[in-house]
């Protein structure tokens, strides 16, 4: 105990005589310091007891107090994490105390509001730094004059002062932005070409089933139809495993499934051998009013029995053939 008392006495003498008041500080931090100090004192006392070969049972109250302090310190830790942001903010504010104190207060009391506004504008970003810096020689268009910079800054200051008065937020006008009005067409990849390039023009060996060997899976199909077939297989598998019927397919899905079966023969897809110059989607596009009127007039001439050109007769024949296929 004498050694402990001497060490404490020397530590007290090393401390400054006038200690700063902590009434305006964070109470949680002060409490943590007090708890840590008490915990260290109790722990040092028990170490001395252990050195004297005494039992802890004689100092049971000190052990209980030590456990209580340990629990309180652990309970403070989550609270300290919550106020960590506020503590860091206060520390940064204390570090900037000298910078803030260097700004002189206005002498007249009537200009307090204007001084506060000017103090806010003191920390605004430098708008001249937002200009693009080109690597090449500076041209007359890229060089910003000092008069323009001052006019821009004055306009921004007026805008900020106006928004501060009426309470309406107005974004800073740093640079004019033009919105793109033109719609860009999306390039849709051709799956047939991709499959041809990846399979036929590649030198990498591939394992392909023989003709007619996988009829249950509809044989070899193109990449575009493979996804539709996979969806149909999953649908059938779900119905068979759950003993239930799913809702009927929509007209769009039925049309896709028929399109898959259209060029299927013997478990193989022969659509590449029957490609027309004009695709079905291209031929089914809606014509303009003048084209439809001409076709209607030509069709009426043929039905009336009047003479028509071979081109008109061929058009009417193809139209009738197309209608019969739809039936």
Swiss-Prot record:
Residues 317-327 have a biased composition (Basic residues). Residues 127-170, 298-327 are annotated as: Disordered. It comes from Schizosaccharomyces pombe (strain 972 / ATCC 24843) (Fission yeast). This is Uncharacterized protein C18B11.06. The keyword Zinc-finger does not apply. Pfam families: Sas10_Utp3 (PF04000). The lineage of its organism: Eukaryota, Fungi, Dikarya, Ascomycota, Taphrinomycotina. The modification Phosphoserine is found at residues 153-154, 309. Keywords: Phosphoprotein. The keyword Lipid metabolism does not apply. GO terms for molecular function: RNA binding. GO terms for cellular component: nucleolus; nucleus; small-subunit processome; sno(s)RNA-containing ribonucleoprotein complex.
